[in-house]
Amino acid sequence: MSTMHLLTFALLFSCSFARAACDPKIVNIGAVLSTRKHEQMFREAVNQANKRHGSWKIQLNATSVTHKPNAIQMALSVCEDLISSQVYAILVSHPPTPNDHFTPTPVSYTAGFYRIPVLGLTTRMSIYSDKSIHLSFLRTVPPYSHQSSVWFEMMRVYNWNHIILLVSDDHEGRAAQKRLETLLEERESKAEKVLQFDPGTKNVTALLMEARDLEARVIILSASEDDAATVYRAAAMLNMTGSGYVWLVGEREISGNALRYAPDGIIGLQLINGKNESAHISDAVGVVAQAVHELLEKENITDPPRGCVGNTNIWKTGPLFKRVLMSSKYADGVTGRVEFNEDGDRKFANYSIMNLQNRKLVQVGIYNGTHVIPNDRKIIWPGGETEKPRGYQMSTRLKIVTIHQEPFVYVKPTMSDGTCKEEFTVNGDPVKKVICTGPNDTSPGSPRHTVPQCCYGFCVDLLIKLARTMNFTYEVHLVADGKFGTQERVNNSNKKEWNGMMGELLSGQADMIVAPLTINNERAQYIEFSKPFKYQGLTILVKKEIPRSTLDSFMQPFQSTLWLLVGLSVHVVAVMLYLLDRFSPFGRFKVNSEEEEEDALTLSSAMWFSWGVLLNSGIGEGAPRSFSARILGMVWAGFAMIIVASYTANLAAFLVLDRPEERITGINDPRLRNPSDKFIYATVKQSSVDIYFRRQVELSTMYRHMEKHNYESAAEAIQAVRDNKLHAFIWDSAVLEFEASQKCDLVTTGELFFRSGFGIGMRKDSPWKQNVSLSILKSHENGFMEDLDKTWVRYQECDSRSNAPATLTFENMAGVFMLVAGGIVAGIFLIFIEIAYKRHKDARRKQMQLAFAAVNVWRKNLQDRKSGRAEPDPKKKATFRAITSTLASSFKRRRSSKDTSTGGGRGALQNQKDTVLPRRAIEREEGQLQLCSRHRES
């Protein structure tokens, strides 16, 4: 009997245990709904989920309450009616009320404190995306800011690039603005203007007047119903709701009071099933059921808290369950596919695109979550237009930014009266100048501030032409930082911003860049370039080595060794001619014995002959007579002809033509490819050339060298080349060729590389880009660009000299004139020597003649005395005495000069030797004359 009882007890225990193991787990789901009707819908949705997922071993249990008008009451109800039931999640609706009494905020705060997930059903406010406030909040609808994605897609479909964003300065407006700006940034675009107003403001006229002055005609509005109504009324008064305008708004802006004042033609959005609370209840229950099933398959799952009892009752599995919910993908939803993003908002949502026609909203398209599908034939645009507005108006007042870069843009200070000085081009036409504001770099030493200045040049003439052709006015200013534009890091972060003219254009400070801006890929990613108005490349500027002529420049054709050999040859040949003619038996060609010896070739004549043949001066006398000497003379003449011809050819090369200089051969020159501190080259900082060298891997070595020496502007670098501080400057060929043509000490060298062009820069969304390119192409065709090129770029001063026939100057031939002057001085010096020598020789001859005359008289007198003749004639006696006295005084003067000489130099000894024989004879004669005279007197 006891055994039977034991078996019965075991059977009952096993059956109860099996029943417990087979029973599904009860999962409570809470809900805070707007009405009792929606509570019933919630319970039905839970039952449908249990039937649909009966095999999941879970059973959902519905626990719900309705909204309370008081936040404290609502929080207490959540604790007492829902959390106390150990709910895994709470669904909450957001019924529209005038003062928004039925907000889900108390539910979100209370459940979030205990980490219980909350699923919003119709809550659209963007504040619930902030997870620092609403920690566990998810929703099956997107926030209002999600409408920015639809606006952005409509901009893409209709090619609207000019927009004005008009938003209220509250959380909703800022969220919409942030999302739209993020999308525009991905498209490398931006709103032309963002206008904000305070919520509840009653006067937005000034704000709309500012919008009316902009180019954009597409206005995107994000505001509450009442604020939207205020904007619509002001826009109607300013005639901003008519033809040409486009108004894109969201769901609030075409609801309630806003719809009463909304203009016909406005385009709004309505979330499909956005207010269908029952549909969202069904989808939310399905998402929770799927997430609970996934959660229970994990380990270490704890049950939700039972009631609101301090902070020790926080659900530890709550954050995990929230992550499971956020990763859920519920494809069978009534409202479509349900997924959540990282903020817990619904990722994909469908919208109806509504058009207000005759005060009624008409659906004219849909947004399927990724693309806009419009029905253009049904759309009536503002002003009753059926054609899509272009979305902008052509502003007739453009802000032009440029940069000082001659010859494209000259910058000069204005006169005292604020006007520009009148000047004329090389063609005699007046220079067209415009007033441009910018830093006063033209006044060194003065404080740097913006002042009116005069701008003119190639680009200014082009701007005037474009303005006249396309009917716009302009105001010109110089770029503030003096740079063309490159990207640089902001505060050492990864974010980069453009500086220079590029930065001013992209930031809206300028509408157009009219300057020698190089077209390159990096810039073209951010701005729109026109067709090139000037094709060019990069080249290298160096200083020209001007040859300096010296006094011995006429001797440069021959080396000093050759000159020495030529001079030696002249004298050797002269001596050989003299010797050959002297020793040749036929050298004198004496016809008879009476021919004088002076007719023969002397050494002096031989020298004259040798120099005369070499210098081609003609031979008047002293030609060799012997055949052997004449053979040598002919050979010497041939030698002289070759020497003179070679000298003449080389003289022209040295004096007339420029010497070939050792310049840079181009970008591949070894001095550039293998940089050193002995050869410095550079370009302009943060320019297109700098970008080019930085991007080219094969030029990295050159870039590292240049980076240390780059200059702030091209003008500074060019001056550094002239001052020998920089050996080579790499820059745009158009600019450097012009500088080399104006400054004759500079020259460009090497072939062009990195060929590109100069273009006019505009923003990507500029309405002028097509017209500007067409105008430039027409200017090329009709020769206007060629005329500008001749007037400004090809106007040269140095080339006219270099292309003219080369002529010799006094500087080249100064040495020759000095040679002539030296010959004159030498001739004058020698003539004095010749005169002195001649006088000395004549004095000696006269003395000899007197001596011989005295001797003859004495001899005659002596013969007369021996023959016994009478006393000599008194006249003869007087003559004899005069001769003897003259001779005596002459001899005395010679002796006194001899005694006063310094020790009897070598010249005196030689003179004594030359005159020793006749002097002794004269002395003997003098002694005899004195004896005769004493004898006669006695």
From Swiss-Prot:
Record note on disruption phenotype: Mutant mice are born at the expected Mendelian rate, appear grossly normal and have apparently normal brain structure, but the pups do not feed and all die during the first day after birth. Cerebellum granule cells and hippocampus pyramidal neurons from mutants lack NMDA-induced Ca(2+)influx and membrane currents, contrary to wild-type.
Extracellular side: 19-559, 648-812
Molecular function terms from GO: calcium channel activity; calcium ion binding; calmodulin binding; glutamate-gated calcium ion channel activity; glycine binding; ligand-gated sodium channel activity; monoatomic cation channel activity; NMDA glutamate receptor activity
Intramembrane region coordinates: 603-624
Membrane-spanning intervals of the chain: 560-580, 631-647, 813-833
CDD domains for this protein: PBP1_iGluR_NMDA_NR1, PBP2_iGluR_NMDA_Nr1
Signal peptide (UniProt feature, chain positions): 1-18
Protein's UniProt name: Glutamate receptor ionotropic, NMDA 1
Reaction catalyzed: Ca(2+)(in) = Ca(2+)(out); Na(+)(in) = Na(+)(out); K(+)(in) = K(+)(out)
UniProt domain comment: A hydrophobic region that gives rise to the prediction of a transmembrane span does not cross the membrane, but is part of a discontinuously helical region that dips into the membrane and is probably part of the pore and of the selectivity filter.
Membrane disposition: Multi-pass membrane protein
Region (Pore-forming): 603-624
Keywords: Calcium, Cell membrane, Disulfide bond, Glycoprotein, Ion channel, Ion transport, Ligand-gated ion channel, Magnesium, Membrane, Metal-binding, Phosphoprotein, Postsynaptic cell membrane, Receptor, Signal, Synapse, Transmembrane, Transmembrane helix, Transport, Zinc
Glycosylation sites: 61, 203, 239, 276, 300, 350, 368, 440, 471, 491, 674, 771
Disulfide cross-links: 79-308, 420-454, 436-455, 744-798
PTMs per UniProt: NMDA is probably regulated by C-terminal phosphorylation of an isoform of GRIN1 by PKC. Dephosphorylated on Ser-897 probably by protein phosphatase 2A (PPP2CB). Its phosphorylated state is influenced by the formation of the NMDAR-PPP2CB complex and the NMDAR channel activity.
